[in-house]
Amino acid sequence: MMIVVMLILSYLIGAIPNGYVIGKLFFKKDIRQYGSGNTGATNSFRVLGKPAGFIVTFLDIFKGFITVFFPIWFPVHADGPLSTFFTHGLIVGLFAILGHVYPIYLRFKGGKAVATSAGVVLGVNPILLLILAIIFFGVLYIFKYVSLSSIIAAICCVIGSLIIQDYILFGMSLLVSIILIVRHRTNIVRIFKGEEPKIKWM
C-alpha cells in the first residue's frame, strides 16, 4: 500500500505545473495561451522572461530530483521482485516525469519532460547528467534549437545508460525519449521547414 502512495505522490508532485502557476500568480498570464502553449521551462523563458524561466527550470528539475529519494524516506518494505522494481528511485522518478507531461491539474496537458527528466537523472547519476548537459549546451550553441538539443541529449542518455550497463535507466530513458520526441513532433516539423525559433542568447 505504501508503494502505491509513494508512486501517486511522485506523480502529483511531478504534475505541479510550475510555469502555469508562476505565470498566473506573478504575471496574470495563462502561459498556455502564449508561445508554444506549453507549460514547461522553455515556453516560460519565452513568455515570462529569463528570471521566471530560470525559476521554472529549477522547480521542474527539483521536483524530479526529490522524488528519486522517496524510497529512502518512505518506510517501504520491498519483499519481492515487483515491489523492488517499483521502489527503485528511477521508477519513482518516472512517475514524476509522467506527472509533468500529463498533469491531472491541467487536464493532462503539460510540459515536454526535459527539465524534470534532468532532475531524475541528477538524483541517480549526476556525472551522467553533467555529460548530457555538456552535449545539450554544445548542440544548442551550434544549432540554437532548444528542441533539437533536448532530443539529442535524451538519445545520448539512452546510449549512455547502455554504456554504463544500467538497464533500468535504459528502459526509463528510452521511454522518456519516445515521449519527448512525440511531444516535440511539431518542433521537428518546424525545424525541417526552417520555422523553428532560434535562441538569441547564445
Swiss-Prot record:
Query: GO cellular-component terms in the record?
Result: plasma membrane
Report the main location listed first in the record: membrane
Keyword match Cell membrane: yes
Q: Where are its TM segments located?
A: 2-22, 54-74, 85-105, 120-140, 141-161, 162-182
What GO molecular functions are on record for this protein? Answer: acyl-phosphate glycerol-3-phosphate acyltransferase activity
| Keywords noted in UniProt | Cell membrane, Lipid biosynthesis, Lipid metabolism, Membrane, Phospholipid biosynthesis, Phospholipid metabolism, Transferase, Transmembrane, Transmembrane helix
Subcellular location per UniProt equals: Cell membrane
| E.C. no | 2.3.1.275
Question: Where does the source fall among the domains of life?
Answer: Bacteria
Catalytic activity annotation? an acyl phosphate + sn-glycerol 3-phosphate = a 1-acyl-sn-glycero-3-phosphate + phosphate
InterPro entries named in the record: G3P_acylTferase_PlsY (IPR003811)
Which residue stretches, if any, does this entry annotate as coiled coil? none
What GO biological process terms are annotated to this protein in UniProt? Answer: phospholipid biosynthetic process
The pathway noted for it is: Lipid metabolism; phospholipid metabolism
What topology does it adopt in the membrane? Multi-pass membrane protein
Which family is it part of?
Answer: Belongs to the PlsY family.
UniProt subunit comment: Probably interacts with PlsX.
Q: What does this protein do?
A: Catalyzes the transfer of an acyl group from acyl-phosphate (acyl-PO(4)) to glycerol-3-phosphate (G3P) to form lysophosphatidic acid (LPA). This enzyme utilizes acyl-phosphate as fatty acyl donor, but not acyl-CoA or acyl-ACP.
NCBIfam families listed in its UniProt record: glycerol-3-phosphate 1-O-acyltransferase PlsY
The name under which this protein is listed is Glycerol-3-phosphate acyltransferase
Q: Which organism is it from?
A: Staphylococcus haemolyticus (strain JCSC1435)
The taxonomic lineage of its organism, from the top, reads:
Bacteria, Bacillati, Bacillota, Bacilli, Bacillales
